[in-house]
Amino acid sequence: MVSYSNNHFAYAFLLLLTIGNTLAFSSSLPDHVQDPNLVVDDVNRSVFNASRRSLAYLSCRTGNPIDDCWRCDPNWETNRQRLADCAIGFGKNAIGGRKGRIYVVTDPANDDPVNPRPGTLRYAVTQEEPLWIIFKRDMVIRLKKELIITSFKTIDGRGSSVHITDGPCLKIHYATNIIIHGINIHDCKPGSGGMIKDGPHHTGWWMQSDGDAVAIFGGKHVWIDHCSLSNCDDGLIDAIHGSTAITISNNHMTHHDKVMLLGHSDSYTQDKNMQVTIAFNHFGEGLVQRMPRCRHGYFHVVNNDYTHWEMYAIGGSASPTIYSQGNRFLAPNTRFNKEVTKHEDAPESKWRDWNWRSEGDMLLNGAYFRESGAEAPSTYARASSLSARPSSLVGSITTTAGTLSCRRGRRC
């Protein structure tokens, strides 16, 4: 008979072996995954394994595979970069500033868009080297113009209450390997055009910004996790112009109209390569539509909690593939807004061929998901015994969506 101590050793050994194999594999993956279903299965395996670990010694008992990867560690503050190993889905290879220096933001007030001062967030995100950016204390940052984030950067708000608000907000422009974690981003406004430093050795002229919380333009390997986003002039998260390899997870979104746009336009066919995973988010109070609104690409929407929408939750046009799995949809009380989905800008004779599938979703208060496309294409029904967590557990999985209160020496 195997003793408990041997079991403990076995769990630890298997966990380390799995992490090592995952890192070795992920380093060789291209931007665009040739078979998106492989990533869907990878998310399913991660969720299934987290569910099993929730019964074991090494787990924080959340069943959320991202959180179970790092939140159990009371020494998270001295091991911040472990977070980069915890992404899942299409954005799983976003390493941010891993292996770079820790850069501490100390100055929230003096935002100079052209000549950023050392100690400011703008100075940090425009450096050439990989950086893991953290914050010395709680702060409110009001940007004068859009913040252009360069490649291989992590913005990590854990341990501080960081708000970016009341001005232009964040932009990822043809950059790669970006992690944005633990930031409150709200009340973002359009920014005037003008000169903005957009790299270590370049300042360019930028057009007026739209007022998005996070705008991704041609970005790849992007992970947005545990942020709280609300009340911006345009979108909360918009990804367009060939952006791909994105995971949007564990966020809390509230009080906003057009929440998330994924795909530039029906005519911009380069977005056919777009691949986005939307997992473990809470779409909360005061939301209207676009959670997300998709075009062309491949979108895996898994284990999210939709507690509020006024028009619809998930929509799209230009034949996107949408796989909705294990979500909880609570329809509004208004009679004519019970439908989760909205097939946009096309007659039924066209959209009935778009591949939209609901699997294991919980539909409450009269909510209904209008499926379309083939009944059992390989997009949805690959032979696998692993699945997302049951929709009945979505409440517990997403209970800490949004920014976290993390303290030194304690589990986060």
Swiss-Prot record:
Binds 1 Ca(2+) ion. Required for its activity. The keyword Signal applies. SUPFAM superfamilies: Pectin lyase-like. Its EC number is 4.2.2.2. GO terms for cellular component: cytosol. SMART domains: Amb_all. InterPro entries: AmbAllergen (IPR018082), Pec_lyase (IPR002022), Pectin_lyas_fold (IPR012334), Pectin_lyase_fold/virulence (IPR011050), PEL (IPR045032). Gene3D superfamilies: Single-stranded right-handed beta-helix, Pectin lyase-like. GO terms for biological process: pectin catabolic process; response to nematode. GO terms for molecular function: metal ion binding; pectate lyase activity. It comes from the Eukaryota. Ca(2+) binds at D210, D234, D238. The active site is at R290. Residues 1-24 form the signal peptide. The keyword Signal applies. Pathway: Glycan metabolism; pectin degradation; 2-dehydro-3-deoxy-D-gluconate from pectin: step 2/5. Keywords: Calcium, Lyase, Metal-binding, Signal. It catalyses: Eliminative cleavage of (1->4)-alpha-D-galacturonan to give oligosaccharides with 4-deoxy-alpha-D-galact-4-enuronosyl groups at their non-reducing ends. Its cofactor is Ca(2+). Belongs to the polysaccharide lyase 1 family. This is Putative pectate lyase 11.
